Design a protein with these regions (language model features):
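Small-residue-centered hinge/linker elements
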Residues: 2-262, 293-376
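Extended, domain-scale alpha-helical bundle/helix-rich regions
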Residues: 265-268
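Short acidic-hydrophobic, aromatic-tinged amphipathic segments that line or gate anion-handling sites
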Residues: 168-169, 279-285
């Protein structure tokens, strides 16, 4: 009997020891895998294996979407035309400072072969267009080659593109830098014919807001106010365009005033732009690929492909942000208010009052914030 107990005791001891060895081995293996995974992740943060190569490449500055002061994550456009144009997808938002950082850094980056600019699909306010145009001009002034192309040029896109060394246009394109316009609908006669009575209370001479309900045309005061705003803006814009293109003062104004006559004589808008010196070359999509291959051959030696290039945000990732980790007890808080002010949260094109109030309260409660800028 004692011999049987001894055998079972030995077997039990062996199984127990074996189980401990297996469990400990598996545990150790799991810990080793986790440890190496963590070390590998940390190491990848400091290695340059994913470093963006910019040597002899063309910075491809072709943002599509809209320029904003501050991106609203996960928010699409509420503009019907934008939704239709984008096929229902959310509109891509590009922060102005990111675009300026890319262009300003490219101006002194000797590794880049050139900068290609195409902003024909980028929506922006005039103030943003002026800043981007100045950044492109700075690149050209630093003797870095800048090539601009678009199928069609609007006021803003031509302002930016005109600062390039070479301006190209599609053979079916047109420069539509005709100046500013403003259109309003007036309902006074409509309501009168529909026999709808309403009351509008106004005070002051320059109160044009309710004019669509009180007039059937633009008032002289409204015309005066608009011209006081638009004329200096247009003069600055045409001045930058004409200086960059070495055009005689008044060329753009004459083009805008008489474009319909010019197009009557020659319906090819691209040819008219070339004759006036607004552009340097008319190209098809195939021709621009071939032309750029001659200027900047790609590694694959494919003359039908665009040159070796680096995108905006890949290039942005190579720029060191010197402000990272810098702490200050004297800060200036900037709160951006873009779009129509309504109740609720901020969304693209909507300045939600709840979010604005929360941001203001957060700034006032931060002792390190010494001033507040409300950018509307």
């Amino acid at each position: 009997m004692s011999d049987k107990k001894s055998i079972w005791s030995t077997v039990d001891h062996f199984l127990t020891k074996t189980r401990k060895i297996i469990v400990n081995s598996v545990t150790a293996l799991i810990l080793i895998v986790i440890t190496f995974s963590i070390l590998g992740g940390v190491g990848s943060m400091f290695t340059s294996s994913d470093k963006i190569d910019t040597q002899d490449k063309v910075l491809w500055f072709k943002p599509i979407g809209v320029v904003v002061d501050s991106e609203v994550p996960g928010s699409g456009s509420f503009d019907i035309e934008s939704i239709i144009a984008s096929g229902g997808d959310q509109v891509e938002q590009h922060e102005l400072q990111d675009l300026l950082d890319v262009l300003n850094h490219a101006a002194t980056d000797e590794s880049l072969a050139a900068v290609y600019v195409n902003v024909s699909e980028l929506g922006m306010y005039w103030s943003s267009a002026f800043k981007i145009a100045e950044a492109v001009k700075n690149i050209r002034d630093k003797e870095k080659r800048v090539i601009a192309y678009a199928e069609n040029y609007s006021n803003n896109s031509y302002l930016i593109s005109s600062q390039a060394n070479e301006v190209l246009i599609s053979e079916y394109g047109q420069v539509s830098a005709f100046g500013f316009s403003r259109k309003r609908e007036y309902y006074k006669d409509l309501y009168k014919n529909l026999k709808i009575n309403y009351n509008v209370f106004t005070a002051g001479d320059f109160k044009s807001g309710p004019e669509p309900y009180t007039r059937d045309s633009m008032s002289e005061n409204d015309k005066l106010a608009w011209n006081e705003f638009a004329n200096p803006m247009w003069e600055k814009m045409t001045g930058m365009m004409e200086t960059a293109r070495n055009l005689t003062e008044g060329t753009l104004q004459n083009y805008g005033d008489n474009a319909w006559l010019m197009f009557t004589d020659n319906p090819e808008g691209a040819e008219v732009a070339l004759e006036l010196g607004l552009v340097d070359m008319i190209v098809t999509k195939e021709e621009i690929r071939s032309w750029m291959y001659e200027q900047f051959p790609n590694e694959d030696e494919d003359k039908y492909a665009y040159p070796d290039r680096v995108s905006i945000y890949d290039y942005l990732s190579t720029i060191d942000d010197k402000s990272d980790g810098v702490k200050s007890n004297n800060k200036i808080a900037v709160i951006n208010v873009e779009g129509a002010i309504t109740t609720g949260e901020v969304a693209f094109g909507v300045a939600g009052s709840d979010t604005i109030v929360d941001n203001i309260q957060a700034a006032t409660q931060d002792d390190s914030v010494k001033a507040l800028v409300l950018r509307v």
